[in-house]
């Protein structure tokens, strides 16, 4: 099965051999009077988790969908440009307004919300051990505690901004790409 997400807020499963549709799922229904109000979009790739996918949509919801049937396992109202991140038994989501929230993985109860990065156009959170890392439109990298969302550090990386989500390598390094073309491998170190 091939999973594809689209700008119309739909996720579609296709057979790998023939590309035939198997199922489709909508993260939200367009509502409102203007085109902007009716916009429902999936900006990130669905996150594949064993027999399910997790997907978030702009002006839609965060949902876990069975990969075989396309049936919704659970959903929660949300608005995000990116797919969620998973780590430490939790779900981390950057909301469309820049707030970052943590949900407990087993019951989706909200653990914390970090609103100090509101309206900074943050990237998808990258989970690196006990920390989350996001970039923003001004080119800063922000390091947050995965446990409580508190800001732990900040680094000016690229004056032209960061739009590509930070990637975590197998050895725990951070792969960061800025809008100005700067590509770096960084390591998180805790000050004593």
Model regions: which residues?
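Extracytoplasmic beta-rich repeat domains
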Residues: 1, 24-48, 72-88, 110-128, ...
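Hydrophobic beta-strand positions that form the internal "hydrophobic ladder"
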Residues: 2, 53, 91, 132, ...
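Structural signature of WD-repeat beta-propellers
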Residues: 6-7, 50, 57-58, 95-96, ...
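Beta-propeller domains
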Residues: 7-8, 43, 48-50, 55-73, ...
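WD40 beta-propeller blade core
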Residues: 12, 63, 101-102, 142, ...
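Short loop/turn segments that connect beta-strands within beta-propeller blades
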Residues: 16-19, 66-69, 104-107, 145-149, ...
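Loop/turn-rich, solvent-exposed surfaces of beta-rich toroidal or solenoidal domains
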Residues: 90-102, 109-143
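Hydrophilic extracytoplasmic domains
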Residues: 95, 136-139, 144-192
């Amino acid at each position: 099965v091939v999973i594809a997400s689209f700008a119309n807020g739909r996720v579609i499963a296709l057979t790998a051999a023939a590309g035939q549709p198997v199922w489709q799922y909508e993260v939200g229904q367009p509502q409102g009077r203007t085109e902007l109000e009716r916009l429902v979009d999936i900006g990130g790739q669905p996150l594949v988790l064993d027999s399910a996918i997790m997907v978030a949509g702009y002006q839609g919801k965060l949902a876990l969908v069975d990969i075989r049937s396309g049936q919704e396992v659970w959903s929660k109202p949300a608005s995000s440009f990116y797919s969620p991140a998973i780590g430490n038994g939790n779900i981390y989501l950057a909301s469309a307004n820049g707030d970052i929230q943590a949900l407990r993985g087993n019951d989706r109860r909200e653990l914390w919300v970090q609103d100090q990065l509101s309206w900074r156009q943050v990237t998808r959170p990258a989970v690196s051990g006990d920390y989350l890392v996001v970039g923003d439109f001004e080119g800063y990298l922000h390091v947050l505690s995965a446990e409580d969302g508190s800001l732990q550090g900040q680094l000016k990386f690229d004056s032209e901004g960061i739009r590509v989500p930070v990637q975590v390598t197998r050895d725990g390094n951070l792969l960061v790409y800025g809008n100005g073309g700067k590509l770096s491998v960084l390591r998180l170190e805790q000050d004593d």
